[in-house]
From Swiss-Prot:
Classification via InterPro entries: Elp3/MiaA/NifB-like_rSAM, Methylthiotransferase, Methylthiotransferase_CS, Methylthiotransferase_N, Methylthiotransferase_N_sf, NA-bd_OB-fold, Ribosomal_uS12_MeSTrfase_RimO, rSAM
The keyword Transferase is annotated on this UniProt entry: yes
GO molecular function terms attached to this record: 4 iron, 4 sulfur cluster binding; aspartic acid methylthiotransferase activity; metal ion binding; protein methylthiotransferase activity
Family: Belongs to the methylthiotransferase family. RimO subfamily.
Role noted for this protein: Catalyzes the methylthiolation of an aspartic acid residue of ribosomal protein uS12.
Name of the featured protein: Ribosomal protein uS12 methylthiotransferase RimO
Enzyme Commission number(s) from the entry: 2.8.4.4
NCBIfam families cross-referenced by the UniProt entry: 30S ribosomal protein S12 methylthiotransferase RimO, MiaB/RimO family radical SAM methylthiotransferase
PROSITE patterns: MTTASE_N, MTTASE_RADICAL, RADICAL_SAM, TRAM
Major localisation: cytoplasm
Organism of derivation: Alkalilimnicola ehrlichii (strain ATCC BAA-1101 / DSM 17681 / MLHE-1)
């Protein structure tokens, strides 16, 4: 649970589950709670009501969310459910009939109404209501997620996100940039741009323009990245599909304006499986694009995720994926076994892959990727880079360069960090590496 100490007032416990997009939703709810004078507490027993922000992306996430709701009911008894699992109200009521209220994702007003019904907001205090301009954040002070859109226009057969969060709705570019400016003003040094499909940003608005800092800016990924670069902090892009217009970002990376880093959820490389998944692009086209990108920006770091054991996946399909990984030499990879989700079109596909085989393929893929990641990291030994410190303990520190995202990638372990502090940029020399992390010293 998230703990934020405030003045004496009605107390709300909060559980945030799921992806960074859901984390941003939690931050928005927490900010509104604090603005209205509620105290956010870290224990169930001291809360007047508990809000659980849930996930429903895969069955395991649904089970975790139901368990969290049950724990909150057992420990407190007064629970408001929100988030993606909130779209499955019948399931929640059947499993936990005692919940006070259920709302879907982004339904902030309904969450607040449910909290008000259980414990009305206190009289406002001009001093206890003060918050940083950027509101309540659940990340360390030096980095923050910047959500630029909601929903998705894709119809991937394994995914129900469009059912949960709707079609693509892009935030106006001036609002996104104003939020980014507030975050930087509050000490953020790294902006992690997120959405369900970052590369589709602005499609729904026909790339409408809005003014920021006296200059018209279009609601489009490249223009947004270019404007964010003016803030003088690291800008990292996540959830980017490899569309042709992504090519426009590479010069910004090569020039050092934004982090030379792309998080692309490719999911597979076999044309047959990609077609069954209804995913854009094929392995060969992506390989050619990666070659061009690295030619223009040699420091480019690529992260992706893949699904193995998708219905109908044969050993030949899996070999195509392994060959793609060898050729692409991606820096960081996550791999999941296929998990059926209620409402997903893939549930109707023939030839399900036995769980044992899917798990074997996952292990084989990750073993291969460990070798690839080790080779990629070894090439950085002997170089110097700027590291953003996440934690400091005496002489030792842990941080990341522009080539490592928080929470999902490896880290850089440093010596010689006396007097340094989290959130500080330091120059470092890299001296060793393994398949996940780098090791070095502060210069």
């Amino acid at each position: 649970m998230s703990a934020i100490v405030a003045a004496n007032s009605p107390r709300v416990g909060f559980v945030s589950l799921g992806c960074p997009k859901a984390l941003v939703d939690s931050e928005r709810i927490l900010t509104q709670l604090r603005v209205e004078g509620y105290e956010i507490v870290g224990g169930y027993e001291e809360a007047d009501v508990v809000v659980v922000n849930t996930c429903a992306f895969i069955e395991a996430a649904q089970a975790e969310s139901l368990d969290a709701i049950g724990e909150a009911l057992d420990e407190n008894g007064k629970v408001v459910v929100t988030g993606c699992l909130g779209t499955k109200g019948d399931l929640i009521r059947e499993t936990h009939p005692g919940v006070l209220a259920i709302t879907g994702p982004q339904d902030y007003e309904a969450v607040m109404a449910a909290v008000h019904a259980q414990c009305p907001p206190p009289a406002r205090d001009a001093f206890t209501g003060l918050l940083p301009a950027s509101g309540v954040k659940l990340t360390p002070r030096h980095y923050a997620y910047l959500k630029i859109s909601e929903g998705c226009n894709h119809h991937c057969t394994f995914c129900i996100i469009p059912q949960l969060r709707g079609r693509l709705v892009s935030r106006p570019v001036d609002q996104v940039l104003a939020e980014a400016e507030r975050l930087v003003g509050d000490g953020v040094r790294e902006l992690l741009v997120i959405s369900q499909d970052t590369s589709a940003y602005g499609v729904d608005t026909r790339y409408a323009a809005a003014e920021w800092r006296g200059v018209p800016r279009r609601t489009r990924m490249t223009e947004l990245a270019d404007a964010l670069a003016e803030l003088g902090v690291w800008v990292r892009l996540h959830y980017v599909y490899p569309y042709p217009h992504v090519d426009e970002l590479i010069p910004l990376m090569a020039e050092g304006r934004i982090a030379p880093y792309l998080d692309m959820p490719l999911q597979h490389a076999s044309p047959r499986i990609l077609k069954a998944m209804r995913r854009p692009a094929g392995g060969e086209a992506v390989l050619e694009r990666i070659r061009r990108w690295r030619q223009r920006c040699p420091d480019l770091t690529l992260r992706s995720t893949f699904i193995v054991g998708f219905p109908g996946e044969t050993e030949d399909d899996f070999q195509v994926l392994l060959e793609f990984l060898e050729a692409a030499e991606l820096d960081r990879v996550g791999c999941f076994t296929y998990s059926p989700v209620e409402g997903a079109a893939a549930n109707a596909l023939a030839d399900p892959v036995p769980e044992a085989i899917a798990e074997q393929r996952q292990a084989r893929l990750m073993a291969l990727q460990a070798e690839i990641s080790a080779r990629r990291l070894a090439r950085r030994v002997g170089t110097e880079c700027t590291v953003l410190l996440d934690a400091v303990d005496g002489d030792a520190a842990v941080g990341r360069s522009q080539l490592e995202a928080p929470e999902v990638d490896g880290v850089i372990h440093l010596r010689g960090a006396e007097g340094c502090a989290p959130g500080q940029w330091v120059p470092a020399r890299l001296e060793d590496a393994d398949e996940h992390d780098l090791y070095g010293r502060v210069l």
